[in-house]
Amino acid sequence: MEILRGSPALSAFRINKLLVRCRDARLAVDDIYAEYIHFADVSAALDEDALSRLQRLLKYGPSLAEHQPQGRLLLVTPRPGTRSPWSSKATDIAHNCGLPQIKRLERGLAYYIQAPQLSEPQWGYLAALLHDRMMETVFTRLEEAAALFAQHAPAPVTLVDVLGEGRGALEAANLALGLALAQDEIDYLFAAFTRLGRNPSDVELYMFAQANSEHCRHKIFNADWVIDGQPQAKSLFKMIKNTFEQTPEYVLSAYKDNASVMEGSAVGRFFPDAQAGRYDYHQEATHILMKVETHNHPTAISPWPGAATGSGGEIRDEGATGRGAKPKAGLVGFSVSNLRIPGFEQPWEEDFGRPERIVSALDIMTDGPLGGAAFNNEFGRPALTGYFRTYEERVDSHNGVELRGYHKPVMLAGGIGNIRASHVQKGEISVGAKLIVLGGPAMNIGLGGGAASSMASGQSDADLDFASVQRDNPEMERRCQEVIDRCWQRGEENPILFIHDVGAGGLSNAMPELVSDGGRGGRFQLREIPNDEPGMSPLEVWCNESQERYVMAVAPERLAEFDAICRRECAPYAVIGEATDALHLSLDDAHYDNRPIDLPLDVLLGKTPKMQREAVSLQAAGFPLNRDGIKLAEAINRVLHLPAVAEKTFLITIGDRSVTGMVARDQMVGPWQVPVADCAVTTASLDSYYGEAMSLGERAPVALLNFAASARLAVGEALTNLAATHIGDIKRVKLSANWMAAAGHPGEDAGLYQAVKAVGEELCPALGLTIPVGKDSMSMKTRWQHGAESREMTAPLSLVITAFARVEDVRATVTPQLQPARDNVLLLIDLGAGHHALGATALAQVYRQLGDETSDVRDAGQLAAFFRVMQQLVAQGWLLAYHDRADGGLLVTLAEMAFAGHCGIDADIGPLGDDALAALFNEELGAVIQIDEADRDAITALFHQEGLADCLHYLGTAQPGDRFILRAGERSLYSESRTTLRTWWAETSWQMQRLRDNPESADQEHASRQDDNDPGLTVALSFDPKDDIAAPFIAKGARPKVAVLREQGVNSHVEMAAAFHRAGFEAIDVHMSDLFTGVQTLEGFHTLVACGGFSYGDVLGAGEGWAKSVLFNLRVRDEFEAFFHRPQTLALGVCNGCQMMSNLRELIPGAELWPRFVRNKSERFEARFSLVEVTQSQSLLLQGMVGSRLPIAVSHGEGRVEVRDAAHLAAIEHAGLVALRYVDNYGKVTENYPANPNGSPNGITAVTNASGRVTLTMPHPERVFRTVSHSWHPAEWGEDGPWMRLFRNARKQLG
C-alpha cells in the first residue's frame, strides 16, 4: 500500500464550525488541521515516473494553506469491507492516465487535533463527532488503513436445518437474519421445503423475505379487511384501481411496471443516430412516465446516502420502464419532526427525545436534501418541485393523547420521464436470452433494505439498521442510463427485451422478478456477478443492495452490439445467467461447486398466505382552537416561520434546475427569483411548446382529526397547484398516491381504509382523475427508551399526491408574480363554501393546538368547475398572476404573491366575515388570481356560468411600493412592510444555510433580501436576438461539424448539440472513449465543445481528472494540441468543460494566464439564474454582444476563479481575457453572494485565450438558447433567447 498526502481538506470556516461543535460538546480542543490522505493498493511497485504521475493526479482542489501536521491523528476512512464511490471513479481515472498497476485508490480524511487535556473517553466521543458510523470508521495510525484493501476468501452458503430441527429452525433464522417473516409465512416455508425434501439455504430464505416483504409485496394494500366487525368488499389496492376502471383515458401503462405511462405529445426528440453519431430531431409520439417513491428508513439512519439512493432508485425505476426510457425531471419532499435550530428554536418546538439509532430532524434536513440534490445534479436531472413539512407534538388525536410526529421521516423522490410508443410495453424473453446485470459491482451494503423498511424503527437490531444503509454513485447510474439511451434510440432495433432496476433486495428480488414477469425461469452463475468484496457469502452477493444496477434480458445474437455500447459508455456489465423454459430458479457457485438456490419460482413468488386485517374505527374528539392571547401580528410572524410555510431557498438552490435545456418553470419566480412556484413545467422537446407538468398536494396534519378529509385535501391541493398551467381536460391529469401510515396503531388501519376509500371510490372518480401509480410505507412509528419511560412517536397518516399532466403550451403557465403597474384586481376563489375551519392548520400548529373542524373538499363538482375555469382563463391569457391557498391560508398566499412581485398589497377581507383570524388562516382549497380591471366583468361572468359566483370575492389590488395592508372595510387590521414580512419568511432558510454552508455567504444573501429598492434581474441587450446572423451561412447548405465532447459523467451534451444544430452546425456525439480507442479523431472537426456535468463525479477536482486523462495519454494529448494549434478552429468549454479545458492550458496557445476554477466560496453547489455582463474581450463567440447584461443558468459547485496572486489577476485583466462577469441587479460588477454565486474575484466567470478562438464559461448558455427555458424573461422576447447569438457567432466565424 502506498500512502500519499493530499491537500488541506477544510477551509477556515469549516474548521471553526468543528471547533464550535467541540466546544458545545465540552471537549477542550485547541486546534484542528485536516488534510486528505490517499491510499493506493498496487499490483506492482510504482517506478519514479508512475509515482510522479500519481502524485500529480492526487493534487487537486482549491489552494489552502498547508502546514506540517501537529497533534494527535484521527483518520476517517470508509468502513473496511466497503468501497466508496470516490474510490471507483478515482481508480478509473488512474487507469485512463496510464497507471494500470493501481488496483484501487481510496481516500481518507486525516484530522490532526491539538487537545492535550482530553481524556481517552473524550477522544472516543470526539472520534464519534468526526465521522458517520454508518459509512465510516476511525483509525489512529495511517498504516491501519491497509484494512481497506484486506482480501478474504469467499464465505460459503449456510443451510438451515428444517428437516432436522423443524419449524423452530426457521423461527431462529427469522430473528438472526432480520427477515421480518410473519408466522403464516414461516408455516408456508416449512411446508414448501418439507414438500421439496431438502433444507433451505440462508440465501433462499433471505431472497424469499425480500421478495415477500411489505415493502415489495404491499401486503396491507392487498389484504382482506374487516372493519368494526364488517367485512369490506374491496382491498385498498382495488379501490385505487377503481380510479383507472372509471377513467382509463390517456393511460398507457398502469400497475404493472416500474413506472406508469400516460399519453404525451408528438414532438421532435433530439438525439444522435447509432451509426455516425449525428444529432438530429426525430418526430415521434413521446409519452410521459410518472413515478414517485419513498426512502424513509434509510434516510432516518443516514440521511445523505438515504436520500441520495432514494432519488437514484426512483430514477432507475423510470429508466427501466418498458424496454428502456429516459428520466427527465425530478421532485424531492421531506416530512420530519421539529428542527429546533440551535439559537433559533421556535415557541411550538418541544424536545420529546428520540432513539439513538436515528438522527435528528435537523440532521436529516441538513444532509438529506444535499444527498437527494447531489444525486439528481450528478445524474443530470433537474429537481423542480417538492415539499417540506415539520410536525412533532403531543396531541389528543384518535387514540387519545399521544406523541405524533416524523421521527421516522418521509423522504419522497419522484419525477417524470419520456418513452417511445413502441417501448411502453416490455418485450418477450426468449429461451436462452442472456440475463445481464448492468452497473456497478456487488458490495456488502444495503442488506435487507426491503425487510428493514417494513419494520417500525426500533423493532430491528441496530446492526441490521447499520447493514441496510446504502451508498450512492450517481455518475455510475448516468453511464448506465447512457447505455439505455443508446438502446432505446435504436427504435425497433432496441437490443433490450426486458429490463428492471435493482432496488430493495438486490439481485435476489430483481432477477426473479425479471424472469417471472417475462414468463421464464433462470439459471444463474454466482461468480459471474461483478464483485468488489470477494469475501462475501452467497447470501451477501445475491441479496446486497449495491446501487446503480439494472437487470435485463438481451437476445444472444444482439450481445456483441450491446457489449460495444457498454464499452463506449464505460459502463460495466456482466452476463450472469440465461432464461429457461422451466419456471425454476437456480444459482450455481463455481467456487464451492454447489447450488445455493434451487427453487421452483412458484415457491418464491407464488400465492403466499393472503393477509387478513381487522381494524376498529376511532374518532378524534377535537377541541375548538383556544384563541386567548393570539394577536394577529404575532400569529403572522409565527406562521411565516413555520417550515411548511417559510421560504425554502436552502432546499432549492442546491439542486440543478436547468440541465436538459427543457425546464420551462422551476421553483424560482420572476426577476427577484422568489421560490413560490405552484408547479414544475418542462418542454416535451427542444423544438416545441408542448410539455409536462407536475405538482404536489399534502395535508397530513389534518389526518389527526379527519383521515378522509386529509386525503381529499391532498388531491385537491395537487389540482389547485396545477390549475394555472395550460392542460385542458382534467382527465389529462394523472396522480401518484404515496401512503405513509403506522399500520397496527390504534385507529390508523381503519383511518387508512377511510382515506383510500375517500380518494379511490369517491373523489377521484367524481373528478375524472386516475391514480395509475403509487407506493405505500406502513411502518411510520419509532420506539425508544426515554430514561425509565418507553416512548413512541407515530407519524400522522400521510398521503402525498403528485399530479402529472401533459401541457398544451408551456408558455401559458401563470406564476404568483404580481404585476403592480397594471390597473389590476385581486380575486379570491374560495372553494371552502364559507367554512373557515382552523383545525390542523399552520396557525393551530404554531400555537401547539390541534383544533376541531378541518378543511375539506366541500364540493367535488365545484373543484372540477374551478379547474375548468382556470383552464379557460389560462388559455385566453387573462390571468396576470395566480397562487393557490394552502399552508398558512390566505395570509400566506397574498404575502408570497407580494414577495414574487416585489410590491405592496391593499386587501379588504371584510367581505369574508367578521373573524379575521379564520378568514386569513383557514386552509380551505382555493386560489387568489390577479386580473386586469378591464377583464373583470367577462371573468366574473365565466365564474357565474360555472356556478362559482358564490366562491368569488373581490379583495383589492396589488400596488407599487412596500406596504402590505389588510383591512376590514375602512378599519385597518394590519399594516407592515413587505420587506419585513419577506425577512421573517426567509429566516428559517437563512439559519439553515448558516449552519450548513459558509455563514458569510448566507448572511450576504439574507441582507440582499432586505433591499426594498432591488430592481430585480435587469436586462440590457446590445443586439437584437431576433437577428439570425447565421442564416446566410445556413442557406448555403453547408453544416460544419462540431465535436460535442463528453466524458463519463457529463450530462449537458444534448442541449449543447441542439444549440449548435440550430446555429447551422452538424453536431456529432464524441465520447472520450472514442478518442482513446482511435474510433474517432478530432481531425475532421472545425469546432470542439466540452460539455458540462460531473466527469468522473469530480472526484479529483472538477474537470481535473478529465483533463489529466488527456494530458497523460500521449496520442490523445497530441491530438488535442494539434486541434488547438490549427488555425480557423473554435473551442468552447462550459462548466465541467470549462474546468477541464482550463487544466489543458499548456496545450492551448495564449492560455498561459488562465485561472483555475475551484470550490465555490459558499462551499455548496449553486444553481442560480444569474445576471452577467459581456465584457470587451478577444472572444470570437461573444462578438457583437459586448455591453449586454443578460441572465444565464448557473449550476456548479466548483466555479470560483482562483489566481496565484494579485499580479496574476491583474495580468488576466490587462490581457483582455475576461469574457463575462457577474453583475448585481443594479448592473455593477460584484463579488457579493448570491449575485456572484461562487465568489470569483472581479466577478469573473468566463475567459478566452489571446486569439479569442477558445472561450471558457462556467454559466450555461446552451441551457437557455430558447427563451422558454429561462426561469424569467422579458415578455417581448421571441423563440430564440439572446444566448443563441453565441452559437450563431460560431457559425459566422466559420463562414
From Swiss-Prot:
Residues 304-326, 995-1017 are annotated as: Disordered. The active site is at C1135, H1260, E1262. Mg(2+) binds at D678, E717, N721, D884. Residues 1042-1295 form the Glutamine amidotransferase type-1 domain. Pathway: Purine metabolism; IMP biosynthesis via de novo pathway; 5-amino-1-(5-phospho-D-ribosyl)imidazole from N(2)-formyl-N(1)-(5-phospho-D-ribosyl)glycinamide: step 1/2. Keywords: ATP-binding, Cytoplasm, Glutamine amidotransferase, Ligase, Magnesium, Metal-binding, Nucleotide-binding, Purine biosynthesis. It is found in: Cytoplasm. Residues 995-1012 have a biased composition (Basic and acidic residues). GO terms for molecular function: ATP binding; metal ion binding; phosphoribosylformylglycinamidine synthase activity. Its EC number is 6.3.5.3. It comes from the Bacteria. Its main location: cytoplasm. GO terms for biological process: 'de novo' IMP biosynthetic process. ATP binds at residues 306-317, 385-387, 677. Monomer. In the N-terminal section; belongs to the FGAMS family. Phosphoribosylformylglycinamidine synthase involved in the purines biosynthetic pathway. Catalyzes the ATP-dependent conversion of formylglycinamide ribonucleotide (FGAR) and glutamine to yield formylglycinamidine ribonucleotide (FGAM) and glutamate. PANTHER family: PHOSPHORIBOSYLFORMYLGLYCINAMIDINE SYNTHASE (PTHR10099:SF1). This is Phosphoribosylformylglycinamidine synthase. It comes from Sodalis glossinidius (strain morsitans). The lineage of its organism: Bacteria, Pseudomonadati, Pseudomonadota, Gammaproteobacteria, Enterobacterales.
